[in-house]
């Protein structure tokens, strides 16, 4: 086995190792009575067979492991050197089980370290993209620091100006959280007035955020477009509408009418149709109920059947009498309901003989009293005359009862009837 030092091997120009430099691993010199190894960088791509083992001249003097690499990029050299020297050393025997366990743990630790190191240097595409963004950002920062605008910005707070890289909502959240964090050290309570001042002073561009009106059943689209200043969209919508549609649009709300007035072309068409409708409404007698609506083709059959015609006198009298009867029946019904709420157990309701309004009827006394304030007639239910207590009816005409009342229970007649049965 030829003895050659690491300096005798051919090295590429990119090798970071320094020739002839010999240091100990981890900056400390440890001496061993076994052997000494002179190591070269494995990343230089020579054959591994050129690694030589140098026996010490004096066996009593401890040798040192001296890898030649000094750069931090040659950590692989040091790890491989330690592993090879540990395997080749005579201390680690094949028959020694304890040493084999130590060797297995070293192998597993080296494999995990190699995997972690390889993951660090992997390029998935995102790292190169972020690296280019960082380089661009560094160049922009250098140019910005040299510019005169960089002197003005330190006086201004960064929270007042919107961050263009963030969404408006995220920028708003960041500003609010930063203000709460600053003031939370002084006062644990939330100062709402201070938050309102911060929100009013900052330009957060929250007015154009999409999705604020999601979930609502009713939404005024034209009002939202006018509030956000989309005049071109409103003009495009109004050009698609006809004259009568514009007339109906102006009746919806004041906001829609203002939108119509702001558009010149649509407002001219609206004014022309309004003049035409007013002229036609003067000629028609039915303009009071129909309004400005002109006859449409879709409802012509319905409009023909519902056209207005002057009613005859007889028909008008009958309709007025029927309406009066409906009103009277409705009012009488309400009166009966109100009086029925005040009835006792032995009382019932009857219509008054004079005014047909509700009257309280007592079955045992055969008396009825009208509850109308203007009437209050008290009469006998047999002869329908003024009530006469226990006296016989004056006219002698007793009205036949609608239903015959049987004998009272416990009387002789009722007992005889029971005996017959």
UniProtKB/Swiss-Prot annotation:
Pathway info: Protein modification; protein ubiquitination
Disruption phenotype: Death at the preimplantation stage. Embryos display normal cell proliferation but mitotic progression is severely defective during embryonic cleavage with multipolar spindles and misaligned chromosomes frequently observed.
Segments of this protein annotated with the region Sufficient to suppress UBE2S activity: 411-421
Region: Sufficient for interaction with RPS6KA2, residue numbers: 236-313
Region (Allows a rapid multiple mono-ubiquitination of the APC substrate, but strongly inhibits the slow ubiquitin chain elongation catalyzed by UBCH10): 352-394
GO molecular function: anaphase-promoting complex binding; protein kinase binding; ubiquitin ligase inhibitor activity; zinc ion binding
Competitively blocks access of APC substrates to the D-box coreceptor formed by FZR1 and ANAPC10: region residues: 296-299
Binding site for Zn(2+) 2: 380, 383, 388, 393
ZBR-type zinc-finger residues: 348-396
Domain of life: Eukaryota
One GO term (biological process): protein ubiquitination
Protein's recorded name: F-box only protein 5
